[in-house]
Amino acid sequence: MRCRSLSHFKDDDFAVVSEVVTHKQNHIPVIKGDFVSLPKHVQRFVAEKAELMKPSAIFICDGSQNEADELIARCVERGVLVPLKAYKNNYLCRTDPRDVARVESKTWMITPEKYDSVCHTPEGVKPMMGQWMSPDEFGKELDDRFPGCMAGRTMYVIPYSMGPVGGPLSKIGIELTDSDYVVLCMRIMTRMGEPVLKALAKNNGEFVRCVHSVGQPKPVATKVINHWPCNPEKTIIAHRPAEREIWSFGSGYGGNSLLGKKCFALRIAMNIGYDEGWMAEHMLIMGVTSPKGEERFVAAAFPSACGKTNLAMLEPTIPGWKVRVIGDDIAWMKFGADGRLYAINPEYGFFGVAPGTSHKTNPMAMASFQENTIFTNVAETADGEYFWEGLEHEVKNPKVDMINWLGEPWHIGDESKAAHPNSRFTAPAGQCPIIHPDWEKPEGVPIDAIIFGGRRPEGVPLVFESRSWVHGIFVGACVKSEATAAAEHTGKQVMHDPMAMRPFMGYNFGRYMRHWMKLGQPPHKVPKIFHVNWFRQSADHKFLWPGYGDNIRVIDWILRRCSGDATIAEETPIGFIPKKGTINLEGLPNVNWDELMSIPKSYWLEDMVETKTFFENQVGSDLPPEIAKELEAQTERIKALKE
């Protein structure tokens, strides 16, 4: 079946005057930028998609400040952005309340073979690590959406680099979008503009093709809420990994529209990494310097709401320690010529969850967004300041009038929320006071430790070290976290989130684990793998560990293990835990070490049974035998544990 949306132009199917004229005699003016200077294959991509989506004009972005000022002025005039007058160049955006988050149920991988994308799950079991759609079905979905979808709107051409422009680990993308909000956010989140096009001409021309539309051609058929066009009923976010292509329709929200982020930097990048021998992971990267002046680099993978950004920007409570951030969300990692694992942060900004962020929980994040930042779905005070849950004690006037994220009057103490729980700040990473001087080093920084973790209210000790690289992969595959459950459930439940990658898997998870195992073979010098749990609770539901800046005490122990100190750990069935007295607890009141580090036999036996069921249901026959052996061996070790 021929799919109109996926058909390609030949070089003579279009011509350029001061406009793009396609072979079907559609004339589309280029209102900014020099179309002729684009590489020919980029011209072809832009022309064929312009023919498909029928924009009224083409705008080639250069990433300059003048361009940003022009777009911001337009957005303010239309009411899309509201200036937060208490700051320099900070703006607030309120979205349609139906378009506020990533939409996992509408996110797809498109491959000819289903099990390239998802695992062989038993009949009747829905895979939770990715969704597959056939190319034929996808073609129909595209043709039901994209033809003519940009009518009456400008199509922006965004050339961008994930990673420093021209770097050995960096990759280029070009996003076509009809949203100027997306342009402004991509300018913060990626390296964007003319330098990318110059690099593209040098690097044999490879780029990831990204197509995004809000899905509301003009004249719009439905009412636009908050000046935010979207089409939630027809939203789709789809990836064609073999073709290095992303299609997104109907949503303007960051994770669905800033296609360099999760779509490219994780789902597509992990496919490129599989082909080229590297890894794309949902991990922070931080540099930690000891009082002796020794610096090591750590990568850490936590599910959402487990403190990744807080750890990346940690303010140590122990004198002499220093933490500097490379990245807070995504790591691209490749083994270097010396055998060590090197990581870059492919992003250029922070796209952080606002609620809960405060000077108490993360002062460095707060310092990062005092200017040049776009806030989405937070509240605004009458004084022109941002506000969200967690800032109640930082407001100068607690009785100040506010407008909440829905555009309604609001005051502290009201039952409704001031900010949406998934409200965001989009801020330049370079504004963070503790950004590492090497954060843009093209070859990356050497990783000594990989840390997994999640919210585990019971049973799981504060920290343990895996027994080996393969056991560490097993530990990562077992990551679970307490999450506020979906609407059809009540209360909270602990949910699986393997490697903190469950929502972002770009191919079969069994193959993903085998990729990790393959990369761990000699001559590669693999980092040590650890698991942390800041969130263990006592019987009366109080946290056993203070967390935040005191987490440096655990990082200290981890780094001493990386230095080869064998005297500070003791072996347990699940890995190596700190010997009593080897974590610095000075100044901490009433830490119940025994409860914090205990490994309850009954809990862990039950956990292994549940994990086995999870692997059987969600990984099935794709589970590597080595991981099955780790599960079996750990179960036997736990059985031998004395009560």
UniProtKB/Swiss-Prot annotation:
The keyword Amino-acid biosynthesis does not apply. The gene is PEPCK. GO terms for biological process: cellular response to glucose stimulus; gluconeogenesis; glycerol biosynthetic process from pyruvate; oxaloacetate metabolic process; propionate catabolic process; response to lipid; response to starvation. GTP binds at residues 305-310, 424, 455, 548-551. Pfam families: PEPCK_GTP (PF00821), PEPCK_N (PF17297). Belongs to the phosphoenolpyruvate carboxykinase [GTP] family. In parasitic nematodes PEPCK carboxylates phosphoenolpyruvate to oxaloacetate thus introducing the products of glycolysis to mitochondrial metabolism. Catalyzes the conversion of oxaloacetate (OAA) to phosphoenolpyruvate (PEP), the rate-limiting step in the metabolic pathway that produces glucose from lactate and other precursors derived from the citric acid cycle. Mn(2+) binds at residues 262, 282, 329. The active site is at residue 306. This is Phosphoenolpyruvate carboxykinase [GTP]. Substrate binds at residues 102, 253-255, 304, 422-424. Keywords: Decarboxylase, GTP-binding, Lyase, Manganese, Metal-binding, Nucleotide-binding. PROSITE patterns: PEPCK_GTP. Its EC number is 4.1.1.32. InterPro entries: PEP_carboxykin_GTP_CS, PEP_carboxykinase_C, PEP_carboxykinase_GTP, PEP_carboxykinase_GTP_C, PEP_carboxykinase_GTP_N, PEP_carboxykinase_N. Monomer. HAMAP family: PEPCK_GTP. Binds 1 Mn(2+) ion per subunit. GO terms for molecular function: GTP binding; manganese ion binding; phosphoenolpyruvate carboxykinase (GTP) activity. Its cofactor is Mn(2+). GO terms for cellular component: cytosol. It catalyses: oxaloacetate + GTP = phosphoenolpyruvate + GDP + CO2.
